[in-house]
Every structure is written in structure tokens, then in C-alpha cells.
Amino acid sequence: MSRVIGIDLGTTNSCVAVMEGGEPVVIANAEGNRTTPSVVAFKNGERIVGEAAKRQAITNPDNTVISIKRHMGSAHKETLEGNQYTPEQISAMILQKLKADAEAYLGQSVTQAVITVPAYFNDSQRQATKDAGKIAGLEVLRIVNEPTAAALAYGMEKTEDQTVLVFDLGGGTFDVSILELSDGFFEVKATSGDNKLGGDDFDDVVMNYLVSEFKKEHGIDLSKDRMAQQRLKDAAEKAKKDLSGVLTTTISLPFITADATGPKHLEMNLTRAKFEELSAELVERTMGPTRQALKDAGLTPSELDRVILVGGSTRIPAVQEAIKKFTGKEPHKGVNPDEVVALGAAVQAGVLTGDVKDVVLLDVTPLSLGIETLGGVFTKLIDRNTTIPTSKSQVFSTAADNQTSVEIHVLQGERQMAGDNKSLGRFNLSDIPPAPRGIPQIEVSFDIDANGIVNVRAKDLGTGKEQRITITSNSGLSDDDIDRMVKDAELNAEADKQRKEQVEVRNEADQLVFTTEKTLKEVEGKIDQAEIDRANAAKDKVKAALEGSNFEEIKTAKDELSEIIQQISVKLYEQAAQAQAAQGGGAEGQEPKKDNVVDADYEVVDDKK
């Protein structure tokens, strides 16, 4: 049976896990690391994902994409080497890398996954994540909120009743969820967050500070230099991480730029106090959603049993201090903030496949859902923090006499006016019999599934005519678009496979040239010179092929040389066998003499007796 993997598709890093022997286990990637940078690049037509993509970002910033998760569910496009890609396609490339690493670990094909998203992701962003999975060749069995997944991993072995606050500050998003845990029962009471707040923003304030200080000193604006920007970004991220463990760090970027007077170097000390001053507003921004979640759950900080920190950015001391001050509790540090979400996704995968028993998960919708009504008012049908799956219906009517159609404008958010909320989509219900306004009965029904994805239905109760819509992401990807992207992804995977095969054949050919030269030196005088000349000619043919880029030429030349070397090896083996046989015959002729010697020894011993 095919295994189901759990994936934390993160803004800056991603992680994949699977259930092994009843326990969730993180799968290391091909590079041996437990997390994979969510970075995609193209270089000379080759697609690079993960650690290798991150390493080359400084020299190839225009064709490298970072933090694509921040654009999920939008119409944003990335142009890489002249080709345009949607956020779903870029995310699918990351998912394909995680899928391949999981398949290498498990030794079998993987076609199904549970993928996590920020709790505060809206419907478009959730649908976009499912689309990315489909493009990557994965059936997404469930979309799980990241804080909920973290609580699943944390609460697996806990039997006592607990009320926990999950504080999840990742690379690009922030979520806070309040859950009640009770021996396998996980119920989300409230969730809140900010999809535009994360570790990237902490990096940016350091970056902006470095740019400002450098401009003061040298009069050069580094924000206009793409390559310098990438170096600054990496240095800012490293400084941020360093300051979680030390009080001061040195940022050194030699040859960051140059002017008429020569090269310029950036050398600066950054203290933790200065970093906290620069990022104070960001830390304070995490407190708003935290207060809101507690308020929605009807709880006070003193009623919390535990605070769980999730996401790499929760390692920042000021963040830990802020949540400790607000809740009055020392945050729990018994989980790895980089891995716990993927582990929770694997647990949910286990629940869906039946490998994990006695776990019940009740999640909530993060934002209110409704429609636009007369005057541009947002009329809510489902309030935020409603347990999902759920459905709700309400009857509306026409706004004008003899109105024969109505447009249903579906929205998600908390503002009073429709225009201030997130538009999820529009659809029309037509052929309504003409009647005075207020007479037709239009029933609008919302269904939210366990993934948090919305289906809307409008029905004319008079005629029974019905219209449905499944909300799709704002990227506007149709089924045909997704199918085309799936095929493109498959072709890319095949191209990657061929490219890998070509590299391997080239390496094998190079190695064969080296071993041939070594072998021919060793066999001089032992085989005919004609055979040595033939091998040398074949070796030179391989070397010439390696100078070019014709894969078939390299492969053919390599195979020819390999066959010649094999024939030489067989002859050497036969010669060695004949020589051994000749030596063996001589030894047999001496055996009787050896027996006589032994007998003589025994005779001497007997004489002494």
C-alpha cells in the first residue's frame, strides 16, 4: 500500500515526515538535512531546488525565487529565464523535491500527502496549495492548519486534559491557535494570525538598517544593486540567528560594491539590543492576534496550561520574552520548532490511513464567510472560529422589481463593508421569474469541508433552479491550466532525470579514462602492444567526446572503451590462471618429498623414545 507523507510547505524552509512504527519521523533530504530551503532557481535551463538553489542565489538573483508562499492564491507571476511561473508551479517544484526525497527514503512511489498551511490562510490560498500538490503529482488528502499540526505532534502521547496556545511564527506567516487537548481529542477553540508577518520581516529590518548605515558612510545606495541585496539578505538572516545565542555579532561583506575610488567593504557590529530596537514593532504585531485568539476562545492567559512555540522565528529572544510576559508562562521548548509541523502532518496522514487510532481532530475556519448584499454590506453566513466541516443556509431575495437574475458575490473577512473583505468569487443565478422585489426566495448555502475549502450554492426556492460554485484560487487556474502544469511538471521531472543520467554517464566516462590509463601502465609487456594501442585509441575517443556536449557520443565511446578494457581484463585473468596452474603442477610433483620429510621427523621422534 502506498505511504502517505506529511509535508510542512514553509515560506523559508520545508520539511517532510512519515509514520514509522506508530511514530512520526522526519525524512532527511538527499543532502542529509532535515529541512529543505523553499528556494527554486533556474540556471542555463536547469531547475535547481533547495539547498543548491539557496547557495547560488547571490550570483543568480534574477532567476532565483524565495518566499513564494507569500504569493499563494494571488495572480502573481515569477519570470525565470524568460518563462513565467505561477506561485502554484514554484511551490510544486519544492513539493516534487520533498516527494523525491521521501520516495528515496521509503523505497517506493509516493502519490498522497497531507500538507499544512497557516491557520490564517484564506480559501484562495488553501485551494492554491491543493493545486500545487496536484501539479507535483500528489493527491492532497487533507489540508491541515500549521498550529493544529504542531498540537497533534505535541499531544500524541499526552493523556491529561490541557488548554494550549500554539504560537507559530514562521518565515513569512504568523498564526496563533488555542486548542483543548484531551486524550486523543484535539479541538481548536479559536485561531488568529497575520499572513504578512514572519522571519523575512525581521531580516528586512536588519537589511534596511545595513543599507542606511552604508549609505551614510559611503554615499552609495545598496538597495539598487540586486546582487548586493541578496548578500545583505543572507547576512541579515545570519545575524538574526546569531543574536539568538550571543549579544553581539559582526557583519562582514567585503567587496559589496565599488565606485570610482575603488571597492567598498561593509563591516559592522550589530548588538542584540539594536536588533530588538529595530524589530520591536514586529514583535508587538504578534501580540494583537494573540489577544484576539484568547478573546475569541473566551479565555484569560491564566487559564492556559501550556504555550508551544512553533516556527524558526520563535527562537528570537524578544519574541519569547513577549509571549512569556503576556501569558505569564515559560514557553514549552520540548518540540523542535522547525520539524513539529511536518510531524503533525504525518500524524494526520496516519489518522486518515488508519495507522493512528483514537485521534479526533476538530479544526475551525479562520475567517468569517458571507455574501455582498444591498448597499455593499458584507452579510456573514458563517462566523470565524466555527468548527469545520460545517454548512449554513440563509434565504435572501431580489433588490429590484422584476429582477430575473442575481449575482452572488462570495467574501471572506471581518469588515462590515464588502469592499474591505477578501473576494473569493462571483456567480450568477438566472431565469428567476419576474416578480416584485422581496418576493423571490433565494437560498444561499455555504459548505466548508475539512480542508477549509468553500463550496457555495444558490437556489431559487420557487423554481428549484440551482447554481453551485467551488471557490478556486485567485490565480484563476482552471482544471485545464492545472492539467497542463501537471504535464509540464512531469516533463520537467523527466528532463531532470535525463540530465542526472547524462551527468552520471559523463562522470563514469571520466573515471573510466583515469582507470584505463592506470591499467595500461600496469599491463605493459604482459599483453600485445596492438591491444594497448587499441585501448589508447578508444580512450582518446572518450576524452574527445568529453570535450563536447553530445551525450550519445560520450555514451557510445564510453561503452566501446569499457568493452576493450573488459577484454584485456579477461586475458590477464586467463594468463594469471594458467600461471597458477603451472605452479600448482610443480607443487604436486614435490608433494611425495614433503611426505617423506614428515615421516622422517616422526622416525626421529620414535628413535628418541
Swiss-Prot record:
Cross-referenced PROSITE patterns: HSP70_1, HSP70_2, HSP70_3
Acidic residues composition bias: residue spans: 598-609
Start and end residues of each stretch annotated as Disordered: 580-609
TM region positions: none
Claim: Ribonucleoprotein is one of the keywords in the record: no
CDD domains reported in the protein's UniProt record: ASKHA_NBD_HSP70_DnaK-like
Entries under InterPro entries matching the protein: ATPase_NBD, Chaperone_DnaK, Heat_shock_70_CS, HSP70_C_sf, HSP70_peptide-bd_sf, Hsp_70_fam
Molecular function in Gene Ontology: ATP binding; ATP-dependent protein folding chaperone; unfolded protein binding
Pfam families tied to this protein: HSP70
Chain positions with Phosphothreonine modification: 173
Factors inducing expression: By stress conditions e.g. heat shock.
Keywords, in A-Z order: ATP-binding, Chaperone, Nucleotide-binding, Phosphoprotein, Stress response
Xref: NCBIfam families: PRK00290.1, prok_dnaK
Function: Acts as a chaperone.
Homology family: Belongs to the heat shock protein 70 family.
Official protein name in the record: Chaperone protein DnaK
Organism of derivation: Brevibacillus brevis (strain 47 / JCM 6285 / NBRC 100599)
Taxonomy of the source species: Bacteria, Bacillati, Bacillota, Bacilli, Bacillales
